[in-house]
Structures are given as structure tokens and as C-alpha cells.
Amino acid sequence: MVKWAVSILVNALLLIVIDGYIDSIHISSIGAAIIASLILSILNVLIKPLLIIFTLPVTMVTLGLFLFVINAITLMMTASIMGDSFQIDGFGTAIWASVILSVFHLLIQKGILEPLRKK
């Protein structure tokens, strides 16, 4: 439960950082970022596995790069659920944001969270 809550907060922080750097992404507040992160995590648990299974041949041919497209789809779904509180202006922006989210989440996970768990 604590790991999940930390993941929600890390994703919310990353969404806020991405909002600051990419003009095509708009998050209205910190609370909206936390709610968007919560919705995104729910979609990642419920919808993302189905998308991965249905697109497995494409994902294999692209050597896993299609997973960024799947992440972009879940980001766009999150934005459509959130309405005006979280907006992404295009699918290309969503792909770019999914790449940034994935890279930074991996860096935070491997560089900060895992070493803290080992102590």
C-alpha cells in the first residue's frame, strides 16, 4: 500500500514537471495532478494489460517501443476523464510525455527508491 501511494505521488510530481516543460500539457493544480496520477494508475492496472495483450505482435515487432504508444493511450484516457483539469493537446504530445514519464520513473525507481528499500 505504501509503495502504491509513493508511486502515485511520484507520478503526480512527474506530471507537474512535465506540465512545466511541455506547453501542450496543462494541469490545473497539484490536486489535479494527484487525481490524474490515481486515475492513470487505475487505468494501468485495468486497461493497460488488455492493450498489451491485444497489441503483442506489434509490440514484439517494434521491440517494445509500441509500449510508449500504449502509455500515451492511457495518458489520453486519463486526460479525457479529468476534463479541463488535465489536458493534452495531441497524441504526439502524449507519446512524448509517456517517454518522459517512463524514463524518469525508471530513474527514480532504480536510483532512489530501490536503494532506500535495501537499507
Swiss-Prot record:
Keywords tagged on the record: Cell membrane, Membrane, Signal, Transmembrane, Transmembrane helix
Superkingdom to which the source organism belongs: Bacteria
Q: How does it sit in the membrane?
A: Multi-pass membrane protein
Q: Name one Pfam family in it.
A: Phage_holin_4_2
Q: From the UniProt record, list the coiled-coil ranges.
A: none
Per UniProt, subcellular location reads as:
Cell membrane
> So which residues are the signal peptide here?
1-23
> Any keyword RNA-binding?
no
Q: Which GO terms describe its cellular component?
A: plasma membrane
* Principal location: membrane
Query: Where does the sequence pass through the membrane?
Result: 27-47, 50-70, 88-108
Which protein, by its recorded name, is this?
A: Uncharacterized membrane protein YvlD
**Organism of this sequence:** Bacillus subtilis (strain 168)
**Name of the gene:** yvlD
